[in-house]
Amino acid sequence: ISDTLHKHLPDDFQSAAQILVDALGPEPATDSLSGFDGFIVMPQCLFISRYGLDDFVTSINALYEMTKRFTAEGDIRTFIEKYPSKTMTFLHTLTQDESPFARRLASEGTRPRLPLFSRLPEFQRDPLPVIKILEKLKSDPNLMVRRSVANNLNDIAKDNPDIVVETLERWQKSAPSKEMDWIIAHALRSLLKEGHPSALNLMGYNPDVKISVSEINLSNDAPAIGEEIEFSFTVRSREDEPSKIMVDYLIYFMKANGKQTPKVFKAAKKNIAP
């Protein structure tokens, strides 16, 4: 669609961008992304990032208007790569914008490992510029924005786990709230699956808790495709005091190359007696 737009819009990029902006509908009445109505703006965002890279001001202003109707999270990355300083300055201003969609762009667009889009290796190496933006959004009143903050930190944790844990420890002390507790849990989800000791400790789990697992039973040790399997096991604490534990289990899935890869699932979160 963006290529077709290019065929029919004026060759002058500023004129073309203005036509696209003028054609945008009103900003959403709600403050969350839902449904598919906004997807019509997706090819327009792509047009800007594909054909407007040499006109920073026009492109950034157009993406700002478009992201308030959909999201320019993938397209802003093109400008982060070519104009890192100017684009990050712009994103910092968005953290104070009235539109939650614009504020979300500041976080979502800087995710080092944003799904469906190319990674930002400079932020994988050094996430501090991103964290400076997240600092301004950590107590945002909008859940959509806070979710983006947590997802961004989850991305960062895959390359810089200790920085994320240290950041969340600081936030927990400086801005304690139920909303912050939610951000911490959501941001640490990958590290918790890995059993990262500091992440477990931040969530209130003792990574060195002494437990035993026994009486493992399978209803079928060789299930065929389409069949169900039930399993059970017993977890006992060997501590002298009650312990908070989180129990996960792994299922290994066969990949096309013949190798198996594990996926972690949650079984239970319990307080168990000695």
Segments from the language model and where they lie:
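Surface-facing alpha-helical segments and adjacent helix-coil boundary elements at the starts of domains
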Residues: 1-198, 230, 241-246
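Non-catalytic, glycine-rich low-complexity segments
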Residues: 198-217
